[in-house]
């Protein structure tokens, strides 16, 4: 199998007939490197996940820490799956941002953890866009 054929196979991960996630890609600037990249908004990732796994579950736990909140998200293909039977897991921490005082650090941490967990489960633009 050629490299191009293998790439096409990778692009079929979590394929849903009639849905093209690349159409929803937005540009953002990486906070660490300043590099402009493309990503999917978390709401689109969640919608894609629901299309692929209608009975799926996204579990989030948030813990307050010193000057921030730490969120852990796990993605399950079925709401019936046991705690350790998840597709992917991610954590994120966020504190107050003086430049955006109206942004809740708790919600920001939750959203970041969910987005990374979904990306780790294959609901992202890791293979193109």
Where are these regions (language model features)?
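N-terminal, Lys/Arg- and Ser/Thr-rich interaction peptides
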Residues: 1-43
């Amino acid at each position: 199998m050629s490299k191009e054929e293998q790439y096409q196979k990778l692009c079929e991960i979590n394929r849903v007939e009639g849905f093209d996630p690349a159409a929803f890609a937005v540009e953002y600037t990486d906070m660490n490197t300043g590099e402009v990249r493309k990503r999917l908004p978390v709401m689109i990732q969640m919608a894609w996940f629901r299309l692929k796994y209608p009975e799926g579950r996204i579990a989030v736990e948030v813990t307050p820490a010193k000057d921030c909140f730490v969120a852990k998200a796990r993605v399950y293909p079925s709401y019936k799956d046991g705690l350790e039977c998840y597709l992917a897991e991610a954590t994120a921490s966020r504190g107050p941002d003086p430049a955006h005082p109206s942004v809740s650090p708790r919600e920001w941490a939750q959203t970041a953890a969910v987005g990374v967990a979904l990306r780790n489960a294959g609901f992202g633009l890791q293979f193109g866009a």
